Swiss-Prot record:
This is Small ribosomal subunit protein uS14. GO terms for cellular component: cytoplasm; small ribosomal subunit. Gene3D superfamilies: 1.10.287.1480. SUPFAM superfamilies: Glucocorticoid receptor-like (DNA-binding domain) (SSF57716). GO terms for biological process: translation. It comes from Rickettsia prowazekii (strain Madrid E). Binds 16S rRNA, required for the assembly of 30S particles and may also be responsible for determining the conformation of the 16S rRNA at the A site. Belongs to the universal ribosomal protein uS14 family. Residues 1-26 are annotated as: Disordered. The gene is rpsN. The keyword Ribonucleoprotein applies. It comes from the Bacteria.
Length: 101
């Protein structure tokens, strides 16, 4: 089980990223617009740099919903490989069966 503080930190990053997503994407699209001069784009670059670091989507860690484990998370289920194997073994994941041949 991961530390509660690290799980909460990741959740706050997700909220901050969602709330500032539109503003961040607008600034980025204007910054990469080559029809604007550098003098026009420079204030936009500064405005983007002044946004909180945790509002960037790259700072969000993909964590297991059950345990908070940061590694080995299967995206389709949002669960770590260990817990997924355990749940599949019990038959709690519909439509997934253990392979045997």
């Amino acid at each position: 089980m991961a530390k509660v503080s690290s799980i909460q930190k990741n959740k706050s990053r997700q909220k901050k990223s969602q709330s500032l997503h539109n503003k961040r994407s607008e600034l980025k699209s204007k910054i990469y617009d080559k029809s604007l001069s550098l003098e026009q784009r420079f204030p936009l670059i500064i405005a983007l740099a002044q946004l909180p670091r945790n509002s960037s989507s790259t700072r969000i860690r993909n964590r297991c919903e059950l345990t908070g484990r940061p590694r080995g998370v299967i995206r389709k289920f949002g669960i770590s490989r260990n817990k997924l194997r355990e749940l599949i073994g019990r038959g709690l994941v519909p439509g997934v069966v253990k392979a045997s041949w």
